[in-house]
Amino acid sequence: YGLARWDAATQNVCCTCDCFCTPEVSYVPQALAFGQSSHTAAVKSYLRWGLPHFEDYASMMVFDALIYNTDRHLTNFGVLRNSRTGELLDMAPVFDNGRSLFFNLAFDQVDSFPNEAQFVLPSWPQVTFDEQAARLIGPRQKEQLTALGDFSFANCEQHPFPEIFLEKLAGHVRRRAEEL
């Protein structure tokens, strides 16, 4: 992932990534891939598809709980399939995390992270991020969280963030990983 200017008229930047689709491999949103309309149904779909695919789904949802992604709806994650045969190949890479990591706070509001974290909720109803993680966390996800013990952000040369902001945000991510 990288950063790029959203448009020439503003100073806003956005996260970018390479396209993961090719003429041979296409992306199908969760809502269309399995014909379901809830995260509970998604869990069942991935379990039926196989444990490795469920583990990928669980890791994405625990990651969302880690970064407080408030926008994980059923069209911004899904599967990759063979464009010619329709065979399901794998879960699509994680993307569209723009409404996370306290995106709504200004750089000078780093001391608001703990307070903000108390009120942010995931996109699926009637569950907190802590509950979301608790329902899906397993040994693989715990190992992934443990690996964040010395996590830090790499700043972008073309679009730098204030170092104090990145340091405080990385500290919050490390503490959050321990909590989960």
Where are the regions that the model predicts?
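Conserved protein-kinase catalytic-loop segment immediately C-terminal to the catalytic Asp
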Residues: 73, 78-80
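C-terminal catalytic region of ATP-dependent kinase domains
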Residues: 68, 80-180
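Active-site alpha-helical segments that house and flank conserved acidic catalytic motifs
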Residues: 58-67
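Short, flexible loop/turn elements at secondary-structure junctions
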Residues: 8, 19-21, 61, 81-83, ...
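Helix-hairpin-helix/helix-loop-helix acidic hairpins
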Residues: 31-59
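A structural signal for short, well-ordered beta-strand segments and their strand-loop junctions
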Residues: 1-3, 16, 74, 91-94
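Conserved ATP-binding subdomain of kinase catalytic cores across diverse folds
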Residues: 1-32
